[in-house]
Amino acid sequence: ADEGFSATVRNGAV
């Protein structure tokens, strides 16, 4: 999965 993207979005980063 796109952990690099999903993790960032879940962290609330833009």
Swiss-Prot record:
The superkingdom of the source organism is Eukaryota
Further facts: On the 2D-gel the determined pI of this unknown protein is: 6.8, its MW is: 34.6 kDa.
Task: Please state what the protein is called.
Answer: Unknown protein from spot 128 of 2D-PAGE of etiolated coleoptile
What taxonomic classification does the UniProt entry list for its organism?
Answer: Eukaryota, Viridiplantae, Streptophyta, Embryophyta, Tracheophyta
